[in-house]
Amino acid sequence: MMKPVPKLWVVISSAFVFCLLVLFQINKSDLIEANLQITHQVNNFLISFVASSNNQILNHTKHANESDGIRAKQLEEEETDTCAGRYIYMYNLPSTFNDDIIKECRPLIKWFDMCPFMVNSGLGPQILVSDKTTARVLTVKTGSWYSTNQFLLSVIFRERMKHYECLTNNSSLASAIYVPYYAGFDVSRHLWGYNVTVRDELAIKLAQWLRERPEWGKMYGRDHFFVTGRIGWDFRRFHDEDSDWGSKLMLLPEFSNLTMLGIETTAWANEFAIPYPTYFHPKSLTEIWRWQKKVKSVKRKYLFSFVGGPRPKLDGSIRGEIIKQCLASHGKCNFLNCFVNDCDNPVKIMKVFENSVFCLQPSGDSYTRRSIFDSILAGCIPVFFSPGSGYNQYIWYFPKDYTKYSVYIPENEMRNGTVSLKNILGMIAKERILRMRKEVVKIIPKIIYNKPGFGPEKIEDAFDIAVDRMLERVAMVKRMMEEGKDVQSQYYSQTKDLKKLEIIHEKTA
């Protein structure tokens, strides 16, 4: 039997429990309040953090979208911009480097008055129908035939550049920079009777002018080019003797970085040959087609021909042997002797070439001749005697397989007198001749300089090909510079062997 709990103990116990309950309630309230405050702060932090993160994400996404949008727009513009990668900037040179040079046209070339040929933006006097021969030889009714002088290439090129579809006034957009310097006329007016200081004076001034231009620092001139109507050796005088020929333009440090386009190159890798100007400067594709049709179907009276003169004082010249064989060919060869005939008459020259199956192209004072392009224009198959006269010069224009459009006879065989031109050319089958002439006629649009403002039809002429290949060259050099490769030795200093004959047989389609 349990003992009864005393009443006092019960009262004390009850009071103690009550106090504990009161204290517990008070602490519980404090804890709850504290917890609520902490929770509120944490929530505020989390809300602020999340909001901040979301804002950063949104901002980042916004900027990314904007960047993507800009890039997409740029890509879209590049895709729609037909001039992307083709823009060319033409320096506005002081007139002392071009226009002022040709204003005094009479003394530009000693013993020859250049003034009559300056008209029509360098194309020369227009050839009009004066007799039946002119009408029969040329398609003069088109108004596209001119008495064009070969040395005016730089003037013709500059005029074409003024009409180039991707010419820009913003040099930062340009992929290449054209320097409209009349280097050929600058040197030719000082070749006789002037010392080397006078010959080099303007070139040195231009080098300094270029070096001070903001465009120069981009590639130090490796994206610059100029055009001349003279051969490369006129600008590579290695000594400073007054008796030495030419100027030292291409030996100046600045110009050693430039690319020169001229009618004939030396062995240096920063020179490229472009065609001599012909007499034909069409203004439409129809004119070209009409001319091609004419020369493709014309009946040719002579097996071969030679337009030129002997070079008795030139060591190693084969012209004497060529003339000898031509005169002894019993009517198979037509010889137009430029020592006694007017070889500046376009009608006379084109008549000879149009009447010939093959046209002989021996070297003269230098490797190349304007006659090469006049004969091709006439649909006459060229006969070369040195690789340096055509194959290793006009690499942008002629097929790599020279057998497709020409005949090659080594100079040595002509000197030895062991070759009969009449026999070699006479043994070529008619079927092959037709194939070769077809190829020659295909080349015609590539070797002529169309009139500025050519019709809407697109066909690449000599100017277009030169510009496109120049842009490709600059792009390659720029890529190599970005990769840290040596461009100087490969693209500017390296020499090539102009006498080497490289046999390449192209696959026929």
From Swiss-Prot:
Glycosylated residues (UniProt): N27, N59, N65, N169, N170, N195, N257, N416
Membrane topology, record value: Single-pass type II membrane protein
Recorded superkingdom: Eukaryota
Single GO biological process annotation from the record: protein glycosylation
Residue ranges of the TM segments: 4-24
Enzyme class: transferase
GO CC annotation: Golgi membrane
Enzyme Commission designation: 2.4.1.-
Keywords in alphabetical order: Glycoprotein, Glycosyltransferase, Golgi apparatus, Membrane, Signal-anchor, Transferase, Transmembrane, Transmembrane helix
Cytoplasmic membrane side: 1-3
Tissue/organ expression: Expressed in pollen grains.
A Pfam family of this chain: Exostosin_GT47
Protein name, entry field: Probable xyloglucan galactosyltransferase GT12
Taxonomic lineage of the native organism: Eukaryota, Viridiplantae, Streptophyta, Embryophyta, Tracheophyta
Gene: GT12
